[in-house]
């Protein structure tokens, strides 16, 4: 389950049931999409137990509309607030858990991942792919384009998850709830069936307190215990609420096999 939390919002991905839909796909495109679907549904169960470092750079801006399309404006405006949160992410038994190590390079004490004010995210390790590719979600896929990325041949598919399998938005001020559809693109290497990137945008009612939520996750092959796995290396999350824009940039690094002797890193220190 993916949770994004602010003072006014909790986002929960629902798990309703229906059938996968495909439109305007060639036989080869449908074959690749089906192979990726099978991989996505098994993904979290095939990952080994591991530890990595998750570093989240959070900024809050004021007065920037359509921030996702203006994020590369130069010079970028100064944020109202910003912080950097370094966490140890432990993946064991198919579940993610987080230990907050530092906040702005200072030891974090007893801070908890989901108790921060502002926006935090989770679920990059297979949850979003399972929700999109699960036949129960009734996701509609269509062909978008062919491109290149870092020297790799890439096929891009558009997708849309309907309202009945969508995302629940709950306004914590009014307790008013909506379930909204979401849509995006998935980037696939057709030779290896690796997923390289996924994007999503929530289709939010105009009268809701949150105007926009966009997410992007980049994946690459990482080696753990001598074997290759396709894992997140970077994620971005943008949310617009009133005149405020919440902008998270998340990096994943230092993947290694989980063991009882794994090392925790605190900034420049290492603690056994």
Which residue ranges define each predicted feature?
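Hydrophobic h-region of N-terminal signal peptides that target proteins for export
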Residues: 8-19
